[in-house]
Amino acid sequence: MDKNMLGDLDNLPEEDKLKMASMIEQLQIRDSLRMYNNLVERCFTDCVDSFRRKTLDKQEETCVKRCAEKFLKHSMRVGLRFAELNQGAATTD
């Protein structure tokens, strides 16, 4: 987002600012839930082979833990990279 656009948001009426904040919050919640669901589906599919017991065995538990850690590290790295690209794009405007 460029600085002119942010300046325009500051000029909005208070009611519109509240609506924008609410929309942004809803989008953040949606994205968080989507990421969580993707993580659960991917790690469960990759790590759990059968339903032998109610609980995960040690191997499945270790696999799920590693999978989740990898997924979160990757997601954080992608987010940082997008932030770097956005910051670079904003400075070239």
UniProtKB/Swiss-Prot annotation:
Top-rank lineage group of the source organism: Eukaryota
Keywords from UniProt, A to Z, are: Chaperone, Disulfide bond, Membrane, Metal-binding, Mitochondrion, Mitochondrion inner membrane, Protein transport, Translocation, Transport, Zinc
- Gene Ontology molecular function terms on file: metal ion binding
For membrane topology, the record states: Peripheral membrane protein
- The residue numbers the entry assigns to motif Twin CX3C motif are 43-67
Q: What is its main location?
A: mitochondrion
- GO CC annotation: mitochondrial inner membrane
Q: Where in the cell is it found?
A: Mitochondrion inner membrane
Q: Which GO terms describe its biological process?
A: protein transport
**Could you tell me which Pfam families the record lists for this protein?**
zf-Tim10_DDP
Disulfide bond annotation, renumbered to this chain: C43-C67, C47-C63
Quote the entry's note on domains: The twin CX3C motif contains 4 conserved Cys residues that form 2 disulfide bonds in the mitochondrial intermembrane space. However, during the transit of TIM9 from cytoplasm into mitochondrion, the Cys residues probably coordinate zinc, thereby preventing folding and allowing its transfer across mitochondrial outer membrane.
Q: What does this protein do, in the record's words?
A: Mitochondrial intermembrane chaperone that participates in the import and insertion of multi-pass transmembrane proteins into the mitochondrial inner membrane. May also be required for the transfer of beta-barrel precursors from the TOM complex to the sorting and assembly machinery (SAM complex) of the outer membrane. Acts as a chaperone-like protein that protects the hydrophobic precursors from aggregation and guide them through the mitochondrial intermembrane space.
Entries under PANTHER family matching the protein: MITOCHONDRIAL IMPORT INNER MEMBRANE TRANSLOCASE SUBUNIT TIM9B
| Subunit comment | Heterohexamer; composed of 3 copies of TIM9 and 3 copies of TIM10, named soluble 70 kDa complex. The complex associates with the TIM22 component of the TIM22 complex. Interacts with multi-pass transmembrane proteins in transit.
**Family to which this protein belongs:** Belongs to the small Tim family.
Q: What is this protein called?
A: Mitochondrial import inner membrane translocase subunit Tim9
